[in-house]
Amino acid sequence: MAKVPSRSPRKRVRKQVADGMAHIHASFNNTIVTITDRQGNALSWATSGGSGFRGSRKSTPFAAQVAAERAGIAAQDYGLKNLEVFVKGPGPGRESAIRALNAVGYKITNITDVTPIPHNGCRPPKKRRV
């Protein structure tokens, strides 16, 4: 029988990226933080729900902070130093997610609000009666 050459397990070399973008989608129910390179390829992501918060606790600023910290720490393997932040949505996790990324050690170059605003498009949902 022919002997199969054994392949030694090689550690995958991660590409080094100096500048990146952080996309924060803050809805009323959840917060999604995605860190990408300049071309938009995702390096890491985290959500409030995936960080262990369920139900109404998903939509808190603290849950958004934890999600942003997790995404930021995971993206540090790529050598990121500077982040450009894009915030979308009206949720309660907008501010705290940006502060958490700053606390992880990233230099935030600029913050842009990319919340989609309709030019009188679809009819909005009716008001809640509690």
UniProtKB/Swiss-Prot annotation:
| Protein name per the record | Small ribosomal subunit protein uS11
Relate the assembly described in the record.
Part of the 30S ribosomal subunit. Interacts with proteins S7 and S18. Binds to IF-3.
Query: What is this protein's function?
Result: Located on the platform of the 30S subunit, it bridges several disparate RNA helices of the 16S rRNA. Forms part of the Shine-Dalgarno cleft in the 70S ribosome.
Gene3D superfamilies (UniProt xref): Ribosomal protein S11
Keywords, sorted A to Z = Ribonucleoprotein, Ribosomal protein, RNA-binding, rRNA-binding
Q: Name one GO biological process term.
A: translation
Q: Which family does it belong to?
A: Belongs to the universal ribosomal protein uS11 family.
Gene for this chain = rpsK
Molecular function terms, GO-annotated: rRNA binding; structural constituent of ribosome
Q: Which PROSITE patterns match?
A: RIBOSOMAL_S11
Which GO CC annotations does the UniProt entry carry?
ribonucleoprotein complex; ribosome
Q: Which InterPro entries match?
A: Ribosomal_uS11, Ribosomal_uS11_bac-type, Ribosomal_uS11_CS, Ribosomal_uS11_sf
Organism source for this protein? Shewanella denitrificans (strain OS217 / ATCC BAA-1090 / DSM 15013)
